[in-house]
Amino acid sequence: MKSAVETLSPTRVKFTVEVGFDELQPTVAAAYRKVAEQVRVPGFRPGKVPPPIIDRRIGRGVVLEQALNDAIPQFYGQAVDEAAVAVISQPEIEVTNFADGEGLTFTAEVDVRPTIELPDPESITVTVDPVTVSDADVDAELAALADRFATLKPVDRPARRGDFVTIDMTVRLDGEVLEDGTVTGASYEVGSAQLVEGLDEALEGLTAGQSAEFDAPLAGPYAGRTARAEVTVRAVREKQVPALDDAFAQQASEFDTLEELRAHIRERIGRTRRIQQHVQARERLLQTLLDSLDIPVPERIVDAEVRSRAEQLRRYAEARGMDAEGLLAQQGESLHDHEAHVRADVERELRVQFLLDTVVAREQLQLQEAELTDYLIQRATRLGVSPDDYANQLVRTNTVPLAVADALRGKALTYLLQRVRVVDTTGAPVNLEGGSTPAAEAEPAVSEA
């Protein structure tokens, strides 16, 4: 076999492969055996029909076609191995010559991972925000915790922000009650802005038994129109928050004193912020590398992924009785802008994958069994399924190699992060130990092939 590689672009190559007919003989012989298993000829057992009989019965051309279908993947794979390129898509094959006794010539165009010259990670400095926990941070957490233990006490006064009221409400458009436009006996926090626009202002100042009407601008299918709403207050209840003392600490936690609870909250906030700092370091390291490197992406893969995500959006919108443009309009985004954002996201995701795959290849990183197990557990947890179910899903969908590649990228990012210099905004060195994040959360993956 002879093969040549032509570089069409930094992300696409063209193979030209020539195979002599003598090299095809094992493939032709195997094709005869396959065909012999499929044909039934009186006097011969299945699989035992001689080649001359097959030639007369169904024609040698059928055998040669089978041999061709088997030979192309085999010799294409050899050509890829010899060229030592990382293919990332299915090849576009064109047979330019194949005749009985003359051998085979074909071309294969395929997308490849671009060559990336990585900088020495030890020359890179990443700056992150420092981890600090103030008394105000602890106070805010304590206040939120106390709020969860608050009780509601009926009061005989006008409603004000923060009160909980029991309400009946009807919303009409052009005199007709809207679908789902009736609320009966609902508990609502005044000032929460949870139901319809204008409700909070209408409720303030009302006492139990009083009603009010107000204009309610609509969203969704009725965006741009204004309905008329009527609300009646049945009851007003005031939220009573417990005092922050040792008794509250014993009620709300495992601690005996408020100071012990405060110390625990401070430590928990610090732990969370160290994880956030680690995530920030990963993101800023990636962005630093992306900014310093020119990493081209294959347009065919980008276009295919953009189309796939557009179809996902279409199905999501359709399930809600809308089209994609209408759904995006609710979010204040045009279809054109959304497509531009999706394309930019896909291109960035591919560049990150190429970058990390290059690290994996250069450093010959491999996954240990425990690392793969951790990855599967983390991914399964995020998806809300058991690790066994997630692993079985990967096997059923033949996506185990994609999962392994994704886990390796996470390991590559950790490898880089351990070798760069990380400092906070004051210039102090940062030790990221203890703030690690799952490799599964590094970057979303784009299916390349």
Swiss-Prot record:
Single GO molecular function: protein folding chaperone
Chain intervals with Low complexity compositional bias: 438-449
A Pfam family it matches: Trigger_C
Enzyme Commission number, as recorded: 5.2.1.8
Keywords: Cell cycle, Cell division, Chaperone, Cytoplasm, Isomerase, Rotamase
Gene Ontology biological-process annotations: 'de novo' cotranslational protein folding; cell division; chaperone-mediated protein folding; protein transport; protein unfolding
SUPFAM superfamilies assigned: FKBP-like (SSF54534), Triger factor/SurA peptide-binding domain-like (SSF109998), Trigger factor ribosome-binding domain (SSF102735)
Catalytic activity: [protein]-peptidylproline (omega=180) = [protein]-peptidylproline (omega=0)
Domain of life: Bacteria
Keyword Hydrolase found: no
EC category: isomerase
Any one of the GO CC terms: cytoplasm
PPIase FKBP-type domain mapped to chain residues: 162-242
Main subcellular location: cytoplasm
UniProt key word 4Fe-4S: no
Residue ranges of the region described as Disordered: 428-449
Subcellular location: Cytoplasm
Protein family membership: Belongs to the FKBP-type PPIase family. Tig subfamily.
Function: Involved in protein export. Acts as a chaperone by maintaining the newly synthesized protein in an open conformation. Functions as a peptidyl-prolyl cis-trans isomerase.
Record remark on domains: Consists of 3 domains; the N-terminus binds the ribosome, the middle domain has PPIase activity, while the C-terminus has intrinsic chaperone activity on its own.
Name under which the protein is recorded: Trigger factor
